[in-house]
A protein has these predicted regions:
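Gly/Pro-rich, tryptophan- and cysteine-flecked surface segments typical
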Residues: 18-129
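Hydrophobic h-region of N-terminal signal peptides that target proteins for export
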Residues: 10-18
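Positively charged n-region of N-terminal signal peptides that target proteins for export
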Residues: 1-4
């Protein structure tokens, strides 16, 4: 029985669907805080690969975990060589926020989160990992 399970596992591991599942993953930042001048949060996503990727589970969250994302300019698919942005415009000053998105496949997807002032100045930033 053990040999059958191992055999099926190896068979699945070689399948494109399984490989795609393994390559899917969340990209997330740690919390950033722009201080008292913080007005909005921008989360940038860029597909540096040669094929389109699927995007899901997008969020910009505060300390309480609630998703404050209110402007999704990414959609569900990001073509190769293209970037997009997620915004949260109703954020509290001095509260930390993070950004997360699941990309499939995620190997060539990069991103960053920025805390900005009302004038658009970057107050804090961090890469998504």
């Amino acid at each position: 029985m053990k040999q059958l399970i191992v055999g099926v596992g190896l068979l699945l591991a070689g399948s494109p669907a399984f490989a795609s599942h393994l390559a899917a993953g969340p990209l997330a930042s740690g919390k950033i805080n722009g201080g008292p001048a913080q007005n909005h949060i921008a989360c940038y996503i860029f597909n540096n690969g040669t094929k389109a990727v699927k995007l899901s589970a997008k969020s910009i969250a505060g300390n309480d975990g609630s998703n404050v994302l209110n402007d999704d300019r990414c959609g569900s698919k990001l073509n190769s060589g293209v970037g997009c942005v997620l915004f949260a415009s109703s954020v509290s000053a001095s509260q930390p926020y993070d950004c997360a998105v699941t990309a499939s496949p995620s190997t060539d997807v990069r991103g960053s989160i920025e805390s900005r002032s009302a004038a658009g100045a970057v107050l804090a930033n961090q890469a998504l990992r």
